[in-house]
Amino acid sequence: MKRTILSLLAAVSLAIPVYAAGYSDGNPTQQTSQSSMMTPEMLLTMARIGGFSLSPNGKQVVYSVSLPSIQDNKAKTQLFFVNSDGSGRKALTDGTRTAVSPRWIEDGKRIAYLTVIEGEMQLVSILPDGTDQRQVTRIPGGITGYLYSQDGKQLVYTADIKLPNEAKDRNPDLDKISGRVITDLMYKHWDEWVETAPHTFVASLAQQPITQGKDLLEGELFEAPMKPHSDESDIAITPDGKGIAYASRKKTGLEYSISTNSDIYYYDLTTGTTTNLTEGMMGYDTHPSFSPDGKYMTWCSMERDGYESDLIRLFLLDRTTGEKTYLTEGFEYNVEQPTWSQDGKSIYFIACVEAESHLYELTLKNKKIRRITQGQMDYVGFDLQGTTLVAARQSMLAPTDLYRIDLKKGTATAITKENESTLAQLGDIRCEKRWMNTTNGEKMLVWVLYPANFDASKKYPSILYCQGGPQSTISQFWSYRWNPRIMAENGYIVILPNRHGVPGFGKAWNEQISGDYGGQNMRDYLTAADEMKKESYIDPNGMGCVGASYGGFSVYWLAGHHEKRFNCFIAHAGIFNLEAQYLETEEKWFANWDMGGAPWEKSNATAQRTFATSPHLFVDKWDTPILIIHGERDYRILASQGMMAFDAARMHGVPTEMLLYPDENHWVLQPQNAVLWQRTFFRWLDRWLKK
């Protein structure tokens, strides 16, 4: 199941500012480099803003920033304080220990955050000047997330519980065994062997540090929050502190692996009883939030079981009558991070429309939706206190910074400029929005990035970027792996088509791809390549094609169908054999929905059409150099897919290399591995595309 926006950004955040005291590792390729072209080292040591919190009076912001050391191959994190007008920036922690997930507590008198104590993640609090640290939790095994009740009397936290271990439970005398006895599905998920489940706990704050809380799912093996990417944003405490709502898919094994049907549950703290608030709603229900007066609850809801990319709708529950209202009916865009206004009359949220993510306001009285912000950018998170809203913003040209938003005018004022000096060293990269006609008579938005000092009288090598997901928009994102800017910085024109099958262009466009993997979306890629080759500045013999995940599948497929359009390929974590992927991947609901069914369902026309488009069936047509990258801890698309593709290319006589990581998952997270990724990526492109 995909998780979006700031929770994921924080999960993989690795960097803090180079001007933070004591964090230079002496590497001359860090941000202090005077290079006029972005290097992998510059990209990977840029400051990365993680979680942030606006004070109750709206005047101050606390936020976390991290910076990896390439030499040490690990990251340090630090908390900073800044006024909401951008003044008074100062460090609150010294970076010697992890400091993440900051929140203002006690009406702004203190700041809570997570840090590592004796090898375990625990909650601490400090004064706003960074002094008087107090340990709030001392939970055995540590915690993973937290929320304070509005009255400050209760703490809700998340922590992992151990699941039964068949091998160890049956053989208690064998204390050094490593084998696993597996009896059902979901034994692996994302990048881990499933040995624990996240649970939600509640405890009184009267006695600190807290050493034990009440498990809301005591005796159950279910997840709350749900793996692999959900967090405490799927939990809400009522304003009166009498109950807790949480999202959970109360299934295990095979049943879990084929269903996306989660629900919102309400735990009554007085009676200890649990009620399903979304009984009969069959899709993915998440992100509960109570109105300021506690009379209503909103949540995000998908309609259909098994469809992880269904439209994310906003619903309202009247807690007195039980009536449910579909607030965003007719709005064909995903609702992210819905947040109540202080007066309870409006709900603010983020939505991606035509490949730009912006802030919106929904007025409850008439259900009218107003777009607040404008521009070629993505807003990826926000915090609201009263009428003050602070948001995290990024684009293909600049990483995340914090901005104060005027809710009436929609204007943005920068609060942070974490990478200002680095960006000032770089050339002027231009990002252009184009609309192209597709072969089925529709319009497709394509982003095009041009190198610095672009001269239309010259010829440039180019890269066609294939998106993953598959139902994931190429918006104005900033990435530390697939970064369009660094590609343009290295002299390439970068072509990024929002082909059929991505959200942000209406429901029909998004859903078209399911059961049509080798169809219209592939024709869209060829359209983008052909249209760009009409430009005189595109080198017709210097176009590469790259992509990860479903984008990697696209690369493998195009390698057998491109008819000499491309001069090299790069596939990261791609699907090579669809039949093998159906059985290897862990989230079977995705395979069932997108592929149409199982390969043994011979009378299932959709499934059989899908499997007939598997890239491994077209290796006989491969004739173009291909680089293959994969992580062996990738349990979404197993490394065997990359190994098969490499072996096939080598045996077929196609120039090929494989970059294989034994300790990376679907992403590449370790600093030195990330540098190796970028260096290998550009070495391959330069070898085949630059004359």
From Swiss-Prot:
Kindly list any coiled-coil regions of this protein.
none
**What is any one of the record's Gene Ontology cellular component terms?**
periplasmic space
Which residues are responsible for catalysis?
Answer: S549 (charge relay system), D634 (charge relay system), H666 (charge relay system)
Give the EC number.
3.4.14.-
Q: How does activity depend on pH?
A: Optimum pH is 6.7, using Lys-Ala-MCA as substrate.
Signal peptide positions (record): 1-20
According to the UniProt entry, its GO molecular function terms are:
aminopeptidase activity; dipeptidyl-peptidase activity; peptide binding; serine-type endopeptidase activity
Q: Which UniProt keywords apply?
A: Aminopeptidase, Hydrolase, Periplasm, Protease, Serine protease, Signal
Pfam (any one):
Peptidase_S9
Keyword Lipid metabolism carried by entry: no
Compartments (UniProt record): Periplasm
What are the GO BP annotations of this UniProt entry?
Answer: peptide catabolic process; proteolysis
Subunit details for this protein?
Homodimer.
Per the entry, what this protein does is: Catalyzes the removal of dipeptides from the N-terminus of oligopeptides. Prefers Ala and hydrophobic residues at the P1 position, and has no preference for P2 residues. Shows the highest dipeptidyl peptidase activity toward the synthetic substrate Lys-Ala-methylcoumaryl-7-amide (Lys-Ala-MCA). Is likely involved in amino acid metabolism and bacterial growth/survival of asaccharolytic P.endodontalis, that utilizes amino acids from extracellular proteinaceous nutrients as energy and carbon sources.
State the family named in the UniProt similarity comment for this chain: Belongs to the peptidase S9C family.
Q: Mind telling me what this protein is named?
A: Dipeptidyl-peptidase 5
Q: Which organism is it from?
A: Porphyromonas endodontalis (strain ATCC 35406 / DSM 24491 / JCM 8526 / CCUG 16442 / BCRC 14492 / NCTC 13058 / HG 370)
Its gene is dpp5
